[in-house]
Amino acid sequence: MKVILTTRNRYLEYGLQALLKEHSVILAREFFLPENRRYIPDFDESWLIISDGLLGRLMRCMFQGRHFLQLDAELLRDDEQISDAIHNGVWTYNSAARPLTMSEMVVMFGYVYRQSRPCRLASEMGIHTKTVNTFLYTGMAKNGLYGVSVRRLVGA
């Protein structure tokens, strides 16, 4: 199981890292970088996603088709609550949905979290702007959201 932490609040991030000291925590802002776009996540890997309210929808969209449990970072109080959620929580696994590739995840995360424009993402990743737009479109299409802007993933 991999634990991924997604929040814009650095204080909350630091507190959650201290709370999860027995797990190896991956920070989403450091994981979804253009350098990591060639990484291939294992198909049977489980992900514990801890995100704030603003980025919850984005993370759910990015991990659709994978085995994951998503928790709201603002509602967590102690490590016992986290371990209870891991053992008794409802793990999401939609085998019918196609999982996003790492390149699609990197583009969607960069577009929403870092608020980078497609031309900036294209230059960082060494690809064309049309390819970035294709990644955004196919990422949304794999979630059944045809013709919907990626910016709609921000919010509760």
Give names to the regions the model predicted.
Residues 21, 123, 141:
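Short polybasic/polar patches that bind polyanions
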Residues 134-138:
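Residues within the DNA-recognition helix of helix-turn-helix
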